[in-house]
Amino acid sequence: MAGEASPVAQNPELVLASASPRRLELLSRLGVSPARVLATDLDESPLKGERPRDHAVRLAAEKARAAAALAPGCLVLAGDTVVGTGARILPKAEDEATARQCLALLSGRRHRVFSAVAVITPDGTLREALSETILRFKRLSDEEIEAYIAGGEWHGKAGGYAIQGSAEGFCAWLSGSHSGVVGLPLYETRRLLRAAGLDVR
């Protein structure tokens, strides 16, 4: 009948637009295993004046669109996690110097982690959600920073740390989504996937 909304397809094929093992593990907690993984290769540089929350939302949507173009008719899930202090976006640490700078900046201070989720349904509809988590790190000694650097957990991580590793011991206080800080906020992800017709635990 004209004007009626199209029915939601039940259990469409899920494509995860990320090769992140931590996102795969988090999805498994929802009883979900993607049919395919499509890692996207995008320029993740912030736009001029872009704030951390907007950066996360934009990148998640761009990753989802890029994967959807390669997997038409599928349900596509993408995410992006950004660490910010005020209006400043902290980089993903690719070398020890960057990780060291990030940890020194976060030492003894509050910061925010924005974890955006984007879903593109088989009919091309984009749905988005954002998790915002506030954390405060203890004051880190030079020795603690160097020991963490030596462990290598920081590599490729936003803000130079992985909360699911030994850096959890740095976190004196957290308000929000622990899974969002890891890389995929489960509450928001579950809500989006269920709305898209996926059978989620």
Swiss-Prot record:
GO molecular function, one term: UTP diphosphatase activity
Keyword hit for Hydrolase: yes
Key words of the record: Cytoplasm, Hydrolase, Nucleotide metabolism
Keyword Flavoprotein: no
Cofactor: a divalent metal cation
Enzyme class: hydrolase
UniProt record, GO biological process: nucleotide metabolic process
Record-listed E.C. numbers: 3.6.1.9
HAMAP family (UniProt xref): Maf
Record's protein name: dTTP/UTP pyrophosphatase
